[in-house]
Regions:
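Face-selective signature of the C-terminal outer-membrane beta-barrel domain
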Residues: 321-339, 367-538, 542-547, 554, ...
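Membrane-proximal, glycine/serine-rich, low-complexity loop/turn segments characteristic
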Residues: 20, 25, 29-32, 59-61, ...
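Short, ordered, surface-exposed loop/turn motifs in non-cytosolic proteins
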Residues: 30-44
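Conserved C-terminal beta-signal and adjacent last beta-strands/turns
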Residues: 702-830
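Outer-membrane beta-barrel translocator domains and adjoining extracellular loop/strand segments
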Residues: 206-208, 272-278, 342-359, 392, ...
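Short Pro-Gly-centered beta-turn/loop motif in secreted/extracellular proteins
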Residues: 35-36, 63-71, 88
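A short, solvent-exposed loop/turn motif at the edges and junctions
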Residues: 44-49, 71-86
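Short, acidic Ser/Thr/Gly-rich low-complexity loop/linker segments typical of extracellular
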Residues: 46-61
Length: 830
């Protein structure tokens, strides 16, 4: 009996000893805020060599797995703080507080600089970049060296790469639609911005599976945390008609729960749909593209959308996220959009075929009405031993387009598309010592009925598509050598009905092993993808081999390089072999082959970057080559003012080369940021039209300089330009110049803004068009009130026109602009 009791006691003690994990949090001793990216090393006694190390996460937390803690010390270092050593304590949460201090980095003493670097985290002190003229977070982010914000979409990129995650206090309240934060969160509420390179959002995969993800995390000022911030705004004005806008939003951003609720209405040209765009994608599952057989009219112009958009938009967005503890969180979002647009536009196109030259003329007056509803529920359990996430999404969208056409055609076109989507993403992983395994499952269903009517044509197409991908994941990593295997089965059921039923189903079995070697800052890997594919209705089956080789090497904390080469095989999407003739729009008839083609593509990439964040210097260079080989071309035949697209069997190889470099530099003493992006692109391939197959070549060059300067507290200025030139083998060089210059003058009480734009577009080698635009704004602040008045399009420009090239085609597009408009508005925050 005594022996049994002694055995059980010993077993219990052993289990307790194994559970003595060392956990803790690193914070600032003055502000008590967590320090992200601090280096924590585990030592035995006072030995200089360490047993293990960790980097603190977005909550400042770290964990070591140790069965014995006696005699162990923890050493914590962080840029700008004094180093600290404390005894390791197992079984309970440790708190390590660091004291701010001046530091020395490679013989350079830095004290309270604007940018600091620690491991893979770059921290921007936004107080050193902000001014009273910044109205929201987006305005500050534009000023940060190394970071760029797209003027129209709002997409944020770092060193030329789009960010993959956007956090506020370590949480993603919008599920990737971060424009809602950037447009609605006040600039003075944010304390710092952190760029986290090689970000691994799954804790159980950290230090196991490196990534190229880039995350942006915003840290709020203490007085802005937790409390509700309410903001309301209303404006009225007049141009050719009465215009208005209105906004009401409430924001609460804490560490355990966050909420963002917004209602907006606009009839002044502002594109509210950009706030619904999901700009981050961090899931391994991507469904097959849904065949889209009818073209809904769109537009793309170098101008800001607000100068072109004639809209009546209402947006309601509700976002809420709860963090139950360190690892569990729930997120819910609801979004509704009602958008009506009127667009008056046109184009003159010329097709330069060897056998014929074709000219077309289109004038279009569109009325576009869109209704969208989206609901998301996201549950996540993100622990160090296991990970589980489930995302459920429902979205419904209805679009109705009424178009009046003139030019080559005089007719009315009506398009209606309804799209209903349901999706579920599930991912679970488990860790045990050197092993990781898990299951991923993805389900997606789409129902897409569409209707196209013009003249004597009445076309209705119904589409149902169900897609699933289910995979098993296993990883073993030891001594720098890793074997990662992803294998599974995916299937697609596609039903098309256009008078008769057509099926385009597909089944795949795949294995994707990843054999990697990692030593210090060097990593290389080989991924020999193998896919078996079957199309049952078409009676075709094939085996694809698509290998990928990659190398990544960090030469130093400043310099890194990576290269990759891949060979891919894949089959076409269903619209490429859908046999029933159909109209895409009023002048494009499609008659494709029934054979499924195998497409082979090769890609090669070389990327290098150099950065000195303390010196506010960032530079990248990217070289890319991509080529595609296939046995069919799309042949264009111009018949009776209609374009008829058919499949032509002819070997074709398309090649593309691109060089892209971005240089960004901040000047602390001048409070200035300057950047330059340079791109050269070359492409060649075959184009089939009017019974002839001909070779085309394209050259495109672009230079984009940008400057943001705040010389004093009462003056800020910005300048950006783009100089682009393009030519083809059959067409001469055309160059366009875009320039924007803006000034903000004032103080905390009042502010005046001046903005000028110049567009010089070559319409033809002998004709160019200059467009001058100007805006004036005035703002007065008193307490919680903000009054503003704006005069837009001062010179009352009516139309914008430009020309560009594509393969053997040149096209000149024009679009009606918003007229001269004046607007006054008032804003109140509490």
């Amino acid at each position: 009996m005594k022996a049994t009791i002694l055995f059980l006691f010993t077993l219990l003690f052993a289990c307790h000893t194994q559970a003595q994990n060392i956990r803790g949090q690193v914070t600032d001793s003055l502000t008590h805020e967590p320090l992200v990216g601090a280096t924590v090393t585990l030592h035995r006694g006072m030995e200089t060599s360490f047993l293990d190390y960790a980097i603190t996460d977005t909550e400042g937390r770290f964990t070591f797995k140790r069965s014995e803690t006696k005699g162990l010390n923890i050493n914590v270092t962080y840029l700008g703080y004094r180093k600290k050593t404390v005894p390791a304590i197992g079984g309970k949460q440790m708190l390590v507080e660091l004291l701010p201090d001046a530091i020395t980095l490679k013989e350079v003493t830095i004290k309270s600089g604007r940018i600091s670097l620690r491991q893979d985290t770059i921290k921007y002190d936004l107080a050193r970049f902000a001014s009273s003229k910044d109205s929201n977070v987006k305005d500050i982010l534009k000023k940060l060296p190394g970071i760029d914000v797209d003027e129209n979409s709002g997409e944020i990129s770092y060193q030329g790469k789009a960010i993959s995650h956007f956090y506020v206090e370590g949480m993603d309240v919008t599920g990737g639609s971060y424009n809602q934060v950037n447009e609605n969160l006040k600039a003075d509420a944010v304390e710092s911005a952190e760029i986290i390179e090689h970000h691994q959002p799954i804790r159980s995969l950290r230090n196991k599976v490196p990534t190229e993800n880039i995350a942006l995390n915003l840290t709020l000022k203490p007085e802005a945390r937790s409390k509700w911030i309410w903001n309301t705004q209303a404006g009225i004005g007049y141009g050719d008609e009465s215009i208005y806008n209105a906004r009401l939003n409430a924001i609460q951003l804490a560490k355990s729960k966050q909420g963002l609720y917004t209602y907006k209405a606009d009839h002044s040209g502002k594109d509210l749909t950009s706030e619904l765009q999901q700009l981050t994608s961090n899931d391994v599952h991507q469904p097959d593209d849904v065949p889209s057989l009818v073209n809904t009219p769109t537009f793309s112009m170098p101008l800001d959308k607000q100068r072109l958009l004639d809209n009546d938009t209402h947006l309601l967005s509700l976002n809420r996220i709860y963090r139950k503890d360190e690892i569990k969180q729930n997120r819910f979002s609801f979004r509704y959009l009602h958008d009506e647009q009127r667009r008056t536009q046109g184009s003159e196109e010329t097709y330069h075929y060897l056998s014929d030259t074709i000219h077309t003329l289109d004038n279009q007056d569109h009325r576009v009405r869109t209704e969208l509803l989206r609901v998301d529920w996201d549950y996540e359990r993100n622990g160090e031993e296991s990970f589980t996430r489930n995302v459920l999404t429902f979205q419904g969208k209805r679009a109705n387009v009424l178009s009046q056409m003139s030019g080559d055609f005089n007719l009315t076109q009506r398009i209606r598309t309804d799209k209903i989507e349901a999706e579920n993403r599930f991912n679970t992983l488990y860790n045990k010592e050197n092993h990781t395994w898990g299951i991923r499952s993805f389900l997606h269903y789409t129902y897409l009925p569409s209707s196209l009517k013009f003249g004597n044509v009445s076309q209705d197409i119904d589409l149902h598509q169900a897609y699933t991908d289910n995979q098993f994941y296993y990883l073993r990593k030891r001594n720098g050598f890793g074997i990662e295997l992803t294998s599974g089965i995916n299937g697609r059921l596609t039903y098309l009905h256009q008078g008769a039923n057509y099926q385009a189903h597909r089944l795949q079995l795949y294995a994707r092993p990843n054999i990697s070697l990692e030593k210090n800052e060097f990593r290389m890997g080989f991924i020999p993808n193998v896919i078996w594919e079957r199309h049952p209705q078409q009676g075709e089956g094939k085996v694809y081999f698509s290998p990928l080789l990659y190398i990544r090497h960090r030469l130093s904390s400043r310099w890194s390089i990576q290269a990759s080469a891949s060979l891919q095989h894949h089959s076409e999407n269903p619209e490429a072999y859908y046999p029933t003739p159909y109209y895409r729009d009023y002048r494009t008839l499609v008659r494709m082959k029934q054979e499924i083609e195998n497409i082979q593509s090769q890609s090669y990439a070389l990327y290098t970057e150099y950065k000195r964040p303390v010196k506010e210097f960032f530079w990248t260079l990217a070289l890319n080559h991509f080529n595609t080989q296939q046995n069919f071309l799309t042949h264009t035949d111009y018949q009776g003012k209609e374009f008829v697209l058919t499949s032509l069997e002819h070997p074709n190889r398309t090649e593309n080369y691109q060089v892209r470099s971005i240089l960004s530099k901040g000047f602390y003493n001048w409070n200035l940021k300057a950047s330059l992006e340079a791109i050269y692109h070359y492409g060649k391939g075959l184009q089939a039209g009017q019974g002839i197959v001909q070779l085309y070549e394209m050259h495109w060059t672009s230079l984009k300089p940008k400057v943001d300067w705040t010389p004093t507290h009462w003056l800020s200025a910005s300048y950006q330009a783009e100089i682009s030139c393009n030519r083809t083998s059959s067409l001469p060089v055309l160059c366009d110049i875009q320039q924007r210059l803006s000034f903000n003058i004032g103080n905390d009480t009042w502010n005046m803004s001046l903005r000028g734009e110049h567009y010089q577009n070559e319409i033809s080698p002998k004709q160019h068009k200059n467009t001058w635009l100007a805006d004036i704004g005035f703002q007065y602040n008193t307490g919680k009130w903000r009054w503003s008045a704006n005069l837009n399009n001062l010179f009352n420009q009516k139309e914008y026109r430009y020309t560009t090239y594509s393969d053997v085609r040149s096209y000149t597009s024009w679009m009606k602009m918003r007229p001269r408009e004046v607007m006054v508005s008032v804003q109140y925050q509490w």
